[in-house]
Regions:
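Pocket-lining segment of extracytoplasmic ligand-binding domains
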Residues: 61-151
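Secondary-structure end/capping motifs
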Residues: 119-195
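Residues at alpha-helix termini
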Residues: 48-50, 88-89, 153, 191-192
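Short phosphate-engaging motifs
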Residues: 16, 36-37, 81, 124, ...
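Short, glycine-/small- and polar/acidic-enriched structural segments
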Residues: 1-57, 66-69, 73-79, 90-97, ...
Length: 212
């Protein structure tokens, strides 16, 4: 997945915070150290230019409890969780992942597989990728996928539609798109996941099975 529309940060409806610039001295949630929400929180705080403390709060459900009880000022979530609270006017969104310009065109979600498996089962892996691409086409072709997703997750169809159309736009799920690697590697170095950016030959090896 390229682009970053699938995570958002929110406050209770009664909060005086309307943007991160209002949140000096406050706390801002992410899931766990090293997660995408962690990296995004750090980037959002840096971009806001104010002193906000990033805190790990676990799952969206656990985070909502902490926010609504006043333990944390700004919560994080990933749809469909939180859509019902938004619709009910209990919370307000104050930031989204894509507020950081570098994330808008960065590939932020992908499938990974064991190299031994890929070497031994290349045809099977290719079939999986083709099936994934066909499924994505079906998901956005009409309302059948909305009905299925609502049934699977136990949420109303309208919340399923909001989740798909607002937070997972079709353009973000182009499987052949791979972009923003330079910025991603800078983040990886800063987070100490790697010691230095990968060379072109290393990138070619890493993505040799990527769907083209």
């Amino acid at each position: 997945m390229t682009g970053a529309d699938d995570l958002f940060w929110y406050v209770p409806a009664s909060s005086p915070i309307y943007s991160l610039k209002d949140a000096a001295g406050k706390t801002m949630a992410f899931s766990a150290n090293g997660s995408s929400s962690n990296l995004a929180t750090i980037a959002l705080i840096r971009q806001a230019g104010v002193d906000i403390k990033a805190v790990a709060t676990g799952t969206p459900a656990a985070t909502l409890v902490q926010v609504m009880s006043g333990q944390v000022d700004i919560g994080w979530s990933g749809p469909p969780f939180g859509i019902d609270a938004l619709q009910a006017g209990k919370i307000r969104i104050v930031a989204v992942y894509s507020d950081v310009p570098a994330f808008r065109n960065m590939t932020v979600r992908m499938h990974v597989a064991n190299l031994s498996f890929l070497t031994a089962h290349r045809e099977l892996a290719d079939r999986f990728l083709r099936a994934n691409a066909e499924t994505l086409d079906w998901m956005y072709a009409g309302d059948e996928a909305i009905t299925e997703f609502a049934s699977m997750t136990g949420i109303p169809p309208e919340q399923a539609r909001i989740t798909r159309d607002k937070f997972y736009p079709r353009g973000n799920l182009a499987l052949t798109r791979l972009s923003g690697l330079d910025d991603a590697m800078k983040d990886a170095v800063a987070a100490r996941f790697i010691t230095e950016p990968l060379r072109n030959d290393q990138l070619d090896e890493l993505f040799k099975y990527y769907l083209r």
